[in-house]
Amino acid sequence: MNIDKKITDDLVANDVSFVTTVPCKQLAGVIDEIEARDEIFHIPSNKEDEGMGLCAGAHMGGKRPAIIMQNTAIGVTINTLAALIQYYRMPLPMLISYRGELREPVACQVEMAVHTKALLAQMNIPTYHFHTQADVAEFDIILKYTFMCNKPVAILT
């Protein structure tokens, strides 16, 4: 199974038509697949909180948005998540590469990994962690849940 294609197929099947991304080596294949799809308008962001603002605008314009980002920027997005996305009950699937776990080659990534899940839990953001390739089978139902309950949802990869 091509995971990048499966993720993108699930986005399209759930009418996600706007995706913003921050450069990410771990999710580069997904980003490339999204860029190749005519059904998805892809706009790169400079920063994660900027991307969330773009997603909010897309949502207000009638689109179903998603963001692809790194967990190391969760701290930067707290205010935007709380004061914009959560306050206005905007559904936002957040596909987040989870840096800083075992075998992480960059030491500074480890510090944010220690806080990522706790910050998401403190904000009452439903969080799912894909540990194996088979976990991607859950992505479709997670997207459905996100749009049904009008909440941001974190999917850690």
Task: Name each region found by the language model.
Residues 1-157:
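Thiamine diphosphate
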